[in-house]
Amino acid sequence: MSRRSQRLTRYSQGDDDGSSSSGGSSVAGSQSTLFKDSPLRTLKRKSSNMKRLSPAPQLGPSSDAHTSYYSESLVHESWFPPRSSLEELHGDANWGEDLRVRRRRGTGGSESSRASGLVGRKATEDFLGSSSGYSSEDDYVGYSDVDQQSSSSRLRSAVSRAGSLLWMVATSPGRLFRLLYWWAGTTWYRLTTAASLLDVFVLTRRFSSLKTFLWFLLPLLLLTCLTYGAWYFYPYGLQTFHPALVSWWAAKDSRRPDEGWEARDSSPHFQAEQRVMSRVHSLERRLEALAAEFSSNWQKEAMRLERLELRQGAPGQGGGGGLSHEDTLALLEGLVSRREAALKEDFRRETAARIQEELSALRAEHQQDSEDLFKKIVRASQESEARIQQLKSEWQSMTQESFQESSVKELRRLEDQLAGLQQELAALALKQSSVAEEVGLLPQQIQAVRDDVESQFPAWISQFLARGGGGRVGLLQREEMQAQLRELESKILTHVAEMQGKSAREAAASLSLTLQKEGVIGVTEEQVHHIVKQALQRYSEDRIGLADYALESGGASVISTRCSETYETKTALLSLFGIPLWYHSQSPRVILQPDVHPGNCWAFQGPQGFAVVRLSARIRPTAVTLEHVPKALSPNSTISSAPKDFAIFGFDEDLQQEGTLLGKFTYDQDGEPIQTFHFQAPTMATYQVVELRILTNWGHPEYTCIYRFRVHGEPAH
């Protein structure tokens, strides 16, 4: 029979003896049940086994160490696997560790001391236990304080475990912090990855309630992870970091002088302790191997993380201290910014691809239209050639006589028309020469009138002085007379120019009427060029041909403190994590800029608003122009946001509260996009500050848009 079979037989016999007695063999019996029962039954029977120590005799000062070690063995036993696993561990070669190795660990001394006191303990137990299994109270006189010592031993065991934890933190904090940093880094990396996914797929959408729930759930999950980690590592899980320190602390506690207790220890109990200690040492070796492997894996992960940080451009962290909170936030911001840049780049590529596809479609459509038009032109040219060939054949089929007669008649008619035109041109030339002679005589007539006035002026002065005696008050100065003469001269020249233009227009009208009567319909090439030139000139003159003194590039500006509040749109142009950062809106400056296209306008709340403009120069206002986009360019073919009734006020200075009303006008939404309104006042003062006050619009309930506002007039100097 092997030694292992003998030990199992001895434990079975000890268990049977312990079940029939209630005295001194209770300790051995309870200890044997720890290895016969399952771990679950061991935990349930732990309290009862400890209570059975109460009738034990006084074992001397070393009993505390034994009780503490026994309690610690019970605690370690609760973490052991079932009996099959223990037998496998027992059969391993590592369980047969030499006593010298255990002495190096700090446990060999206690084992040898227990081995030396084996005979004494057996004899003492035989003395205390009776053959019938019962014992007398007289045998246990002086042993009433065992319960107090067992409670103190449990407290001492808890203190020893706490001391081992503190000793591990004090001696090797690097490993503890590396493990904690690895666990926190992995958790944080997963959280940042989840946050990036939330930013892309959830937070960019406008789910306010879901976003609030996720922001609440994120710290809750973090708190749950921290709580689980604290529960997992306290109090026994922390022993897995450095089991050698825990065993050293327990061995140090067990090396106290225990001569009296060793005399009472039984042989089966000692062998059970030896077996448990050997298994504990084997587990310690395996845990140390696992810790070494875990440390190497952690170092590999740390090196990989550092390479990743260097690759991503993040500043490297020296040593093994880990990343701080600010560095982690910086890494998170870097990841988010890179993700955002990648999304923007993808959006730009998709937009460019879509625009390219639309351009390709437009090119294809344009090419198709061009091909269709070319086919139509070719078809029309072929039809024309066929018609010409038909006319040629018809003309060749006509007789020569009929052709000559018709040709002679047509030539006569054309000669008559040409003669009439020559006569009309001669009459027109005569009229033009007469008008030119009259225009040429005008300076002579003006000079004659001037000479006559100058010749008669002294006589008039003498007559005026001779009349009434002291009438010097009514004298005219020379400057006033010259001003009146210049005014008379300008009036005469203006009248002559009007007469000349009127005569030219009458001649052109009569000529066109004559040509229409004679059957000549159409315009000449010179007239077409003249019309096109006039149209291009009018377009180059800002489409109205009037100087704009409210142009921002010319020096005008908007007094923003005296304008209505700008209407803000509800759609954010830029947002971060679903939070709007910037809304798109135009300032009142846009009404002074010539860039007019749909949407580029200044909008204010409601149908009523105002804007005050400082002109580029002090002028005498003559007209204002209001411009809006046409209905054809509007997406819904309506311009209900256009102003309808408005008024113009003039201010002498910027700080003036109420201005002078210059006029009230109405913008027609069915008219031209650019509408000019002239002031009706015969005399107008000079102003440099003008207010545009919108009274109503064309029906939009939320806002009113102004695209461009112009002011025309004459300079004050």
Swiss-Prot record:
The modification Phosphoserine is found at S12, S38, S54, S110, S113, S116, S136. Residues 273-296, 348-440, 475-506 form a coiled coil. Changing L536D: Disrupts interaction with SYNE2. It is found in: Nucleus inner membrane; Nucleus envelope; Endosome membrane. Widely expressed. Highly expressed in heart, lung and muscle. Weakly expressed in fetal heart. Slightly overexpressed in some heart tissues form patients with congenital heart defects. It holds the Pfam family HTH_SUN2. As a component of the LINC (LInker of Nucleoskeleton and Cytoskeleton) complex, involved in the connection between the nuclear lamina and the cytoskeleton. The nucleocytoplasmic interactions established by the LINC complex play an important role in the transmission of mechanical forces across the nuclear envelope and in nuclear movement and positioning. Specifically, SYNE2 and SUN2 assemble in arrays of transmembrane actin-associated nuclear (TAN) lines which are bound to F-actin cables and couple the nucleus to retrograde actin flow during actin-dependent nuclear movement. This is SUN domain-containing protein 2. It comes from Homo sapiens.
